[in-house]
């Protein structure tokens, strides 16, 4: 039996079958959600965290943001019962013997700090392996609170929470996806499960929107970095890993933490196209092939264009790359642009691309205007 992949508009409800042995993902329900083209703003690598939950009796809240898919061991039990790879709360009870059931308002919650504040385009509430102990429904709210607020500050009465996903029934052992159409910048989410139960993973897809005051204070920074508002627009091949890995923070940690393409059997080449945070002047380039040893790109070139209708201008000609090496290049003069493209020859991979520079006056003004429009 194989995992089920219905249309992107599918909504999963109801129990999954009890685990019957073999591959636990064989009857997992999922869909190809269009919003997953965006970056995961709740990525631990970006600095996201689950900072509080009202209950985590059976399984800890931090599991929600673990990078890999949830694991299941049918024989793994502890002193409190079955150990699950997710966030699981105790069973709610009513106030008395006459009313033993939870009320319609009863729910459990977890507070999530986004690693990169931004506009949320979609949320996946994954109940993998929670077959009969998943929540009846979930809801998701968002707030924009500057600085580094504590859980108590986020729960204060003066914090305005906006509904991103209304209370909606979900299914067990399924990727429950929700498109979000709220055009606002958020820093924190509150995930609610009604009335109780377990969630394996949470993914929050969207566009990072950085604070322009912070970028102005930095002066020179990586203008294509995900955390600074850069994003991948398209790529020629995503066979082994996502192109967004190339603009993640820090150095690659292992081979699959970069971007690797399938082997080419023609005379073409592979590429990634990026949108910069805003119009910027680029002064230096880094291309890192860390952990890519027998599968590193052989050569790379970098081009930029200024505006959607601009022409591509090569700023780094086709240059030989070494495996498992960080390559640094300085430009003879700053080059202004809004988009960038890296071409690798003939195939293979790179782990990171860095474009160091600063916002132009026009770019800073546009970023500030968008930040303010989004409620930043």
Curated annotation (Swiss-Prot):
The keyword Hydrolase applies. Pfam families: Allantoicase. One of its GO terms (biological process) is purine nucleobase metabolic process. One of its GO terms (molecular function) is allantoicase activity. SUPFAM superfamilies: Galactose-binding domain-like. Its EC number is 3.5.3.4. It catalyses: allantoate + H2O = (S)-ureidoglycolate + urea. Pathway: Nitrogen metabolism; (S)-allantoin degradation; (S)-ureidoglycolate from allantoate (aminidohydrolase route): step 1/1. The keyword Hydrolase applies. Keywords: Hydrolase, Purine metabolism. InterPro entries: Allantoicase, Allantoicase_dom, Galactose-bd-like_sf. It comes from the Bacteria. Belongs to the allantoicase family. This is Probable allantoicase.
